[in-house]
């Protein structure tokens, strides 16, 4: 792995991350965000999402894919909802 990998900077809910870019085909690069284990980012995102969703009358939270489970769990705690 290169010591100077190309990255894309993002800020989510005030938390800054530099996402490594991966070339998926010649000339096409994508940034990968993996929230598994990133508790600082998950908690901040859940806090801001809970505020944004405050006026919705949700009864339960559902997520479709394993990597989003930490965010769904943190959001359920912040909103007091089952998931």
PLM features per residue range, with description:
Residues 1-57:
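Active-site-facing substrate-recognition patch
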Residues 60-83:
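Glycine-rich, small/polar surface segments that engage phosphate groups of diverse ligands
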């Amino acid at each position: 792995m290169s010591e100077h990998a190309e990255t894309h900077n993002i800020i989510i809910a005030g938390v800054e991350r530099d996402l490594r870019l991966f070339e998926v085909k010649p000339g096409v690069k994508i940034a990968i965000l993996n929230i598994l284990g990133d508790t600082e980012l998950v908690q901040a995102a859940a806090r801001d999402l809970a505020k944004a969703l405050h006026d919705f009358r949700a009864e339960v939270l559902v997520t479709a894919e394993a990597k989003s489970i930490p965010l769904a769990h943190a959001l359920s705690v912040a909103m007091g909802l089952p998931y």
